[in-house]
């Protein structure tokens, strides 16, 4: 189980990303359309002044149940440990153990 503080920190990052997503998109579009180098520099500085955690690259997928950041299955939103336990307990519809 991940520490509560790490899970809360990740939630805070998700809120920041959502809050600044539109502004980041606008600044990047202006940078793309800018003609002069000075204008691009000013827009780049504007982008750099935004909070660091508002960038989507700082997000990390976490298991919805345990909060584990590694071995994450995107299709289910679970870590491999929780996925395995839930599959064995028939809590995931349509998931069967393979054998050949």
UniProtKB/Swiss-Prot annotation:
BP GO annotations: translation
SUPFAM superfamilies associated with the record: Glucocorticoid receptor-like (DNA-binding domain)
InterPro entries (UniProt xref): Ribosomal_uS14, Ribosomal_uS14_bac/plastid, Ribosomal_uS14_CS
GO molecular function, one term: structural constituent of ribosome
Assigned GO CC terms: chloroplast; small ribosomal subunit
Pfam families: Ribosomal_S14
Keyword Ribosomal protein: yes
Subcellular location: Plastid, Chloroplast
Keyword terms, alphabetized: Chloroplast, Plastid, Ribonucleoprotein, Ribosomal protein, RNA-binding, rRNA-binding
PROSITE patterns: RIBOSOMAL_S14 (PS00527)
Family label: Belongs to the universal ribosomal protein uS14 family.
NCBIfam families to which the protein is assigned, alphabetical: PRK08881.1
Biological role: Binds 16S rRNA, required for the assembly of 30S particles.
Subunit structure: Part of the 30S ribosomal subunit.
Protein name, entry field: Small ribosomal subunit protein uS14c
Organism: Chlorokybus atmophyticus (Soil alga)
Gene assigned in the entry: rps14
